[in-house]
């Protein structure tokens, strides 16, 4: 996978997304907007982040959050083009399942896994909704740069908890909320957005539109707790070795503050 595509995912930081417009939280409208993005130019505009990368400058090889997944049943939320499912398949997971809001993304996943000699059960649905995924079934549920698209964080975490066996593990990554507030300007880091502002906004990028909300870190932590998870590990640090390969404003920013966060939680 192209490293540049990994890096593009984190471009959604303060001062780097163009002109954001505040919008009302209308679930159907947000789903339609974001589904259209991923059915058309999502990969071209935003890029793809997939295992072994959790985001820019963070990798599973360094973090070792999954451990041995051989014989394990795995579900990916927001499976994108299938690279993370392929990674788990190569590590001998016994069952691969993937969910995505975009049928176009799922078709890419089918084609990609077929070329890799793998298969997965794929479901097209928003992550917030009931979609026939079995309960108390999976050893791992994971999401690489997808959870932040949900319109109902606590509801999504409750659904994910229902899919997991007791003591099952949920791992996800997303843009760090501080990254969304700070921009690198003239060799300085400048706050451009209020950290506490969780309102929804739309951004136009290359004739396409996306709609998001930038949630506080505490919002994720509290939603996990309410859904019956206990957090085992949270990672904010970037990998120095990966950062050394780049010399631009984004990598300089990543040396000063977190751009990605990862949480590993266990179902009680």
Go through the PLM ranges and name each one.
Residues 227-229, 248-268:
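Core SAM-dependent methyltransferase catalytic element
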Residues 154-169:
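A short glycine-rich, Lys/Arg-flanked "PGG" loop and its adjoining helix->strand segment in the class I
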Residues 8-70, 83-84, 170-200:
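Conserved class I S-adenosyl-L-methionine
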Residues 75-130:
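Class I SAM-dependent methyltransferase SAM/SAH-binding core
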Residues 131-140:
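A short acidic, Gly/Pro-enriched loop at the edge of an enzyme's catalytic core
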Residues 139-154:
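A short SAM/SAH-binding and catalytic strip from SAM-dependent methyltransferases
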Residues 210-235:
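Short alpha-helix
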């Amino acid at each position: 996978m192209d490293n540049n595509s990994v890096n593009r995912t984190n471009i959604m930081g303060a001062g780097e997304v163009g002109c954001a417009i505040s919008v009302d939280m209308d679930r159907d409208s947000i789903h339609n907007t974001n589904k259209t993005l991923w059915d058309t130019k999502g990969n071209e505009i935003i890029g793809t982040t997939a295992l072994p990368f959790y985001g820019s400058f963070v990798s599973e090889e360094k973090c070792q959050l999954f451990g041995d997944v051989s014989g394990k049943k795995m579900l990916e939320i927001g499976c994108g083009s299938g690279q993370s499912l392929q990674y788990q398949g190569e590590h001998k997971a016994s069952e691969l399942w993937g969910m995505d809001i975009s049928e176009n993304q799922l078709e890419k996943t089918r084609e990609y896994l077929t070329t890799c000699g793998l298969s997965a059960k794929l479901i097209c649905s928003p992550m917030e909704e009931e979609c026939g995924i079995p309960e108390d079934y999976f050893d791992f549920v994971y999401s690489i740069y997808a959870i932040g698209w949900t319109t109902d964080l606590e509801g999504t975490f409750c659904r994910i908890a229902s899919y997991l066996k007791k003591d099952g593990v949920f791992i996800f990554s997303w843009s760090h909320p501080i990254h969304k507030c700070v921009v690198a300007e003239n060799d300085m880091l400048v706050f451009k957005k209020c950290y506490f502002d969780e309102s929804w906004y739309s951004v136009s990028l290359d004739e396409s539109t996306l709609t998001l909300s930038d949630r506080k870190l505490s919002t994720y932590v509290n939603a996990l707790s309410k859904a019956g998870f206990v957090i085992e590990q949270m990672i904010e640090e970037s990998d120095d070795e990966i950062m050394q390969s780049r010399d631009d404003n984004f990598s300089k920013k990543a040396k000063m503050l977190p751009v990605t966060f990862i949480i590993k939680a266990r179902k009680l």
